[in-house]
Curated annotation (Swiss-Prot):
<feature type="transmembrane region" description="Helical">
    <location>
        <begin position="28"/>
        <end position="48"/>
    </location>
</feature>
<feature type="transmembrane region" description="Helical">
    <location>
        <begin position="98"/>
        <end position="118"/>
    </location>
</feature>
<comment type="subunit">
    <text>May form homotrimers or homodimers.</text>
</comment>
<feature type="transmembrane region" description="Helical">
    <location>
        <begin position="128"/>
        <end position="148"/>
    </location>
</feature>
<keyword id="KW-0812">Transmembrane</keyword>
<keyword id="KW-0007">Acetylation</keyword>
<keyword id="KW-0256">Endoplasmic reticulum</keyword>
<comment type="similarity">
    <text>Belongs to the UPF0220 family.</text>
</comment>
<protein>
    <recommendedName>
        <fullName>Transmembrane protein 50B</fullName>
    </recommendedName>
</protein>
<dbReference type="InterPro" id="IPR007919">
    <property type="entry name" value="UPF0220"/>
</dbReference>
<keyword id="KW-0333">Golgi apparatus</keyword>
<feature type="modified residue" description="N-acetylalanine">
    <location>
        <position position="2"/>
    </location>
</feature>
<dbReference type="Pfam" id="PF05255">
    <property type="entry name" value="UPF0220"/>
</dbReference>
<keyword id="KW-1133">Transmembrane helix</keyword>
<dbReference type="GO" id="GO:0005789">
    <property type="term" value="C:endoplasmic reticulum membrane"/>
</dbReference>
<keyword id="KW-0472">Membrane</keyword>
<feature type="transmembrane region" description="Helical">
    <location>
        <begin position="56"/>
        <end position="76"/>
    </location>
</feature>
Amino acid sequence: MAGFLDNFRWPECECIDWSERRNTVASVVAGILFFTGWWIMIDAAVVYPKPEQLNHAFHTCGVFSTLAFFMINAVSNAQVRGDSYESGCLGRTGARVWLFIGFMLMFGSLIASMWILFGAYVTQNIDVYPGLAVFFQNALIFFSTLIYKFGRTEELWA
């Protein structure tokens, strides 16, 4: 079941060579998702300025997601595999630990945003939009991180 799409071929457009534009497309899509996540949260903060409506402590999920975005994308895949020419101060093990901590921060922020959504808004029978804004901010930053990390190639002349 895991490889049921291995032989599937998407229809190809002959006018555009996407392999040359892979890094550009992945970077633009990741940037749009990242921007949209923060835009939604800023909109919620403007619409609901009182702490009773949107607690200002709920912004920390987005801050930690953003920190995790930079942590995850600061480590190249070659450093994780051990293929890079420079080993750095901690080498391959340090890169893997750094990447693991980044993913733990990212998943922790996403889970905390779901907790905020359901614990502070859905069960309290108040307006749910601030909770949805916190959740979608973290979800969009999460998907932005995955696209920016794994959607690009690291080969300079691919």
